[in-house]
């Protein structure tokens, strides 16, 4: 399987370990990534641009879709925020031919045209739907038995459901749990798994953002979680990067490692943790890896 790879901004900047782990995992799973076709693609706007200029945001995403179309490839992302923003933009574009035509007028300058055939897809869904769980099971060489994991979807990969295709693909609602179970770990369910991590308000209300980090991580920890796994790099940035602040605010040492989805998958595939930069997180994964008898 070959995809036009849209890594998003964060995995090439603040979370390089996500990008590295993705390359390692896709290599073993037989997912071929074409980075060249989208090398000059723009940021999705992350929902922030859309609040100020919806048309500009849709134009940028239509440009990315047109590049993937030109390459003749489906589009894969590893960012839940990118997934959500792209899916919403795509819904607006394909549901309104006149609007799409006007956007394409802007794309003519680069010799591009979006025909409406792209369905942006997160790596999580590609594993569950395109590869299939039977295939994924066959690739698992290290069962992570005894590990208790709290899934954290965040906002953008679960809503709005109509833009994300949940009606046609109801398995997406529990896709993260399916992967956790497939690697042999135990799912620790908790109410906050589909709520906001707090990242969008970090710069305007840092106190509440840190409080949200504390609420989610403490709840998961108190329910027995050894770690939390997320398909969203922005959620990882907040839940991992600001967990020390959350610990200070809550006056307790939370110490809950936050794992990127590809890192979790990679551990089950036998990939060296150092290759996936699991030693580069703010909240140390050393104890977790030691308990799994995996060298940190």
Short names for language-model regions:
Residues 1-296:
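Iron-sulfur cluster-binding electron-transfer modules in prokaryotic oxidoreductases
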């Amino acid at each position: 399987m070959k995809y036009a790879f849209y890594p998003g901004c964060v995995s090439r900047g603040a979370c390089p370990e996500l990008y590295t782990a993705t390359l390692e995992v896709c290599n073993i799973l037989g997912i071929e990534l074409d980075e060249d076709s989208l090398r000059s693609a723009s940021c999705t706007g992350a929902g922030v641009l859309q609040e100020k200029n919806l048309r500009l945001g849709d134009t940028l995403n239509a440009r990315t879709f047109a590049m993937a179309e030109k390459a003749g490839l489906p589009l894969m992302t590893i960012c839940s925020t990118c997934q959500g923003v792209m899916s919403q933009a795509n819904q607006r574009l394909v549901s309104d031919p006149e609007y799409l035509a006007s956007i394409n007028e802007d794309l003519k300058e680069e010799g591009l045209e979006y025909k409406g055939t792209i369905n942006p897809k997160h790596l999580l869904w590609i594993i569950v739907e395109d590869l299939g769980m039977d295939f994924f099971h066959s690739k698992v060489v290290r069962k992570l038995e005894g590990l208790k994991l709290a899934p954290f979807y965040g906002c953008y990969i679960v809503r709005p459901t109509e833009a994300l295709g949940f009606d046609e693909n109801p398995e997406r609602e529990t896709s993260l749990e399916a992967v956790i179970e497939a690697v042999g770990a135990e799912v620790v369910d908790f109410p906050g798994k589909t709520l906001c991590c707090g990242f969008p308000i970090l710069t305007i209300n840092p106190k509440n953002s840190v409080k949200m980090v504390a609420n989610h991580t403490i709840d998961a920890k108190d329910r027995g979680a050894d770690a939390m796994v997320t398909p969203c790099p922005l959620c990882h940035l907040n839940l991992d990067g600001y967990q020390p602040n959350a610990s200070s605010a809550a006056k307790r040492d939370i110490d809950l490692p936050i794992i990127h989805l590809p890192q979790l998958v990679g551990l089950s595939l036998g990939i060296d943790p150092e290759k996936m930069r699991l030693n580069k997180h703010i909240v140390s994964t050393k104890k977790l890896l030691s308990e799994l008898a995996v060298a940190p």
